[in-house]
Design a protein with these regions (language model features):
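ATP-dependent carboxylate-amine ligase catalytic core
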Residues: 2-115, 119, 123-150, 159-163
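A short, charged/proline- and glycine-enriched loop
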Residues: 3-6, 246-252
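Beta-strand->loop->alpha-helix junctions that form or flank phosphate-binding loops
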Residues: 41-42, 177-185, 278-285
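C-terminal and late-domain segments of enzyme folds
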Residues: 112, 246-249, 261-271, 278, ...
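A short helix->loop->beta-strand "cap" motif at the edges of active sites that frequently abuts
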Residues: 117, 175, 325-329
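Internal gly/pro-rich beta-alpha loop/helix module
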Residues: 129-245
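Phosphate-binding active sites in nucleotide-utilizing proteins
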Residues: 249-325
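Cysteine-nucleophile active-site neighborhood
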Residues: 303-383
Length: 459
């Protein structure tokens, strides 16, 4: 197995079709076969990767073609494959759903072509028979250049039902049906307004997933799946120039990591560590002091669910304000922005005092605000960019931030060649920068260089 590279993308007909649940079961099942698995997720989602990591113990990585140029994304993929026998890549939304109407832009299908990976299509078998072959045929012929290698059927009532579906699909589509997923209520993933509950919040019942993997072992032809997943070659990639391991030497970064703040791309943390930065984790919820540091990173998460506890930890808020006043280079994304604001109004209308470093008020709403990919151009110097530089990222939040100071980034959402929305966002005060944008540092090496340079000036 080690002599060959194996990978496949598990795609679906749409969101909510069971991709994440099956991905988790297959990760556990392949590990039972003593294979070194490397999970990936197409797109920017943090929640699915968190579940991947919790189930198999290996940090799952995001493959996002909006934020990352193809050579960089390919290099990221190849780097993780060095220590893996097989990559299990969970797709995003439906197979051909991307950013806009072009099925070859930011879609699962586009990622499969870029990486040269076969696609396994997950389809819903509930209350259907031969008509399911028509569904599969539509996906098969929509893009004949795509390597659609096999099918797995979800929500199958019985083996007899499965045989009916399998025979229809294989007869009319000439595609192998690799197995099915029976109803398994014990592994249903909990959800709330932002999608799945994080694996960190949910007590992962490892025995349930062990049992689910045992079920899949009986209903999915894993040997056939492995045979189909052999790659002829790994994609060609190239990292941009990265900060060398002396750029961050002597710098310590305090990383907020608890129930309220835990949305981070592992690649970003890797890049910081490779630059020589010492990373120390702390909890804004539970700790009474900050680590001794010259950099602080407050990532995304769910501060609105823990607003009372965050507000009650006045000692931590005081230490954060003192760090800001000393010039510590503080970077905050989404939930981190809400925490650094003056106040946070939760969904019940209760207002909580926050750090008051970025003057402004966060208020929870009932609908997503500016959801999706966007570009942000610096209008003045910021922690991550100088004027004119463009940062690509994504926003996913139900809150809105009402600032008391002008924003420093010009943001816009462009889809299918049209500007859909323009706004300003991102706030810089002293050496602190916060915005709703989630970013991947590998898109622009300058982002880390700016942050490290700011931190080094205060040594």
């Amino acid at each position: 197995m080690a002599a060959r590279h194996h990978a496949f993308i598990l795609a679906g007909t749409g969101s909510g079709c069971g991709k994440t649940t099956l991905t988790l079961g297959l990760l556990r099942l392949l590990q039972k076969r003593a294979l070194r698995v490397q999970p990936f997720k197409v797109g920017p989602d943090y929640l699915d990767t968190g579940w991947h990591t919790a189930i198999c113990g290996v940090a799952s990585r995001n493959l996002d073609s909006f934020m990352l140029p193809p050579p960089v994304l390919n290099a990221l993929f190849c780097e993780q494959m060095r220590q893996a026998d097989i990559a299990v890549i969970e797709g995003v939304m439906g197979l051909y759903d991307g950013y806009g109407v072009d099925p070859n832009y930011c879609s699962t299908a586009a990622m499969a072509k870029q990486l040269g990976c076969p696609v396994i299509l997950l389809v819903d078998g509930k209350a259907v028979s031969t008509s399911l072959a028509a569904t599969v045929m539509g996906f098969q012929h929509f893009d004949p250049t795509l390597n659609l290698a096999g099918v797995i059927v979800n929500r199958v009532a019985s083996d007899a039902h499965y045989q009916l579906l399998k025979n229809a699909i294989e007869h009319y589509c000439s595609l192998p049906v690799l197995g099915y997923v029976p109803p398994c209520d014990g592994v249903a993933l909990p959800e709330r307004h932002l999608g799945l509950i994080t694996a960190r919040e949910s007590l992962v019942n490892q025995q349930s997933w062990h049992d689910f993997a045992a079920t899949l072992e009986q209903t999915v032809d894993v040997d056939a799946l492995l045979s189909l997943s052999v790659l002829s070659a790994l994609p060609t990639g190239m990292w941009p120039e990265r900060p060398d391991n002396t750029a961050g030497a002597g710098l310590t970064l305090a990383l907020a990591d608890d129930e309220a703040f835990n949305f981070y791309y592992p690649d970003n943390i890797d890049l910081l560590e490779r630059a020589g930065v010492n990373i120390v984790r702390f909890s804004p919820l539970h700790d009474r002091a900050l680590p001794d540091c010259k950099m602080i990173w407050l990532g995304g998460g769910y501060p609105e669910l823990y607003a009372a506890e965050l507000a009650a930890n006045t000692v931590m808020l005081k230490h954060l304000r003192a760090a800001h006043q000393r010039g510590v280079a503080i970077y905050a994304e989404c939930g981190g922005l809400m925490y650094l604001g003056s106040t946070l109004e939760d969904s019940g209308g209760e207002i909580h005092q926050m750090a008051n470093i970025i003057p402004g008020h966060s208020k929870m709403g009932k609908r997503l605000t500016r959801f999706g990919y966007c570009e942000a151009q610096a209008m003045q110097p910021t922690l991550l960019a100088v004027p004119g530089e463009i940062v690509r990222g994504h926003e996913f939040h139900y809150s809105d931030f009402i600032p008391e100071t002008p924003a420093v980034m010009a943001c816009r959402k462009v889809r299918d060649g049209r500007v859909l929305q323009e706004w300003t966002g991102g706030w810089q005060t002293g050496n602190t920068f916060a915005s709703y944008l989630h970013v991947h540092f590998a898109q622009r090496p300058e982002m880390l260089q700016h942050w490290l340079a700011t931190a080094r000036r205060i040594l």
